[in-house]
């Protein structure tokens, strides 16, 4: 007689084993109709799974995040159902849930076109609208293998052979004549899967290994209702308009090419952005009393072995040989910073020692994962490492948190999600050390009034960490900042200091990044601002345009005056109509468009309009320069107003 305890604390007793769907029906027909699955003692289960003992039960519907994830997973199976009807020879690989949707990797000789994808989507919708039941069967390993062998599903057989124990009982989900294998849970009926769209097709190697066959990966998105689907597609349209690769080309900021995959060729205006970002962070380093250092680009393999990186990261490291020695281009800066710390005897009085570098790093990312500035092989980190005593950890972490929030606020990012990753199962040090480390991070977060989520067991083996994820104007999440405690690397590389009692002690090392990769952060900013950078960051802050040749010398004078005062100004003396010039520089997103005719020249003025079309009227050149300089010094996010 199972007793079911619901989230509100109420209990329901049943004479026999029941399913989540039975419990929902006992509560009411509306809930039974909406029930997708159940959370039984914290674990998601299919709505049809029997409950035989006393449990805590939460009934999952599409109003729950888990419910939406479940219907997305079922849409992946629906895709399998449809593609097997249209191309029966297709071999199905894997079809997981991803952010906002799902994908399925398929082995199909026919190369799918846009027209094929549109027809596939129609077939999926036609199948879903029949509202057929999804039938779950738990079978023996052998029955599952026999099922897929009879259907020629070689990838499903490989998953069974390589990933599932013969003692296990896999779950098969039957979508009419189509059968798939999955941990589940899945929707009980396809009435929940009416609001989806197939988005694109890409190549993907089986198991992510380039030695294996290239499959076709079909991406889709799925939502609980029509309104949510439409809102998501609208966000995607806006994101496409803001795509940093598209805007980067329009504004002539940078380019990538095949001869240097994942490496950025910065053009003049793009490099101006990069340097301004670096200048801003360098100013922050001064405010928070960091030393700035520069380490070598590559170091002997021996050092990477001592640091432990060779064992963990060698596949992602670029290597070269010279004079019978093997070198690795650095994928990160920390071992180099320990070498600088180790030069000369350090005392406890020298701590904390804050060491920062704009470190040029390289990682051999898979070519298929490269994506504009967001995922590159060569990148610059705003990296820092703080060497301190254990007693100083909380204060130093608190300083890092302040720096992160100060920095993000300058760019207009205020919606920051903070996560604290705690001790993993495999770790160095004793529980007392981890207790102190985790408490220090929690105290630092509390001191800064920061709400945070704890991720149990997600810390590195050498220490807990804090992650900062910012949300942009399209509500996309970007994990940028990290504060990571490290109790291992200093000891591995022989870092010590003389303590107050004259003993030799190993410092705690704090890895700190705020922007992360400057390239990636610039990609985020390009999309956040849609290329309309704040004045302080804009490559060209003002462009001065003449109406006729008579004003050419005056334009030169105005531009020189602006440049002498630190304003990035340019001129446009082309023999074109002024309306044409204004349109062109508006498309270049220049913050201020300054027009001079005879009257402006006579009165030593400029006629000012913003890139958004706001007419600020005629302003004396000295006054305008002072106004813009103030904007720049304040790093204002807004343009001047009427």
Curated annotation (Swiss-Prot):
Zn(2+) binds at residues 334, 385, 511. Binds 1 zinc ion per subunit. It catalyses: tRNA(Thr) + L-threonine + ATP = L-threonyl-tRNA(Thr) + AMP + diphosphate + H(+). It is an enzyme of class 6 (ligase). The keyword DNA repair does not apply. Belongs to the class-II aminoacyl-tRNA synthetase family. Homodimer. This is Threonine--tRNA ligase. It comes from Shewanella loihica (strain ATCC BAA-1088 / PV-4).
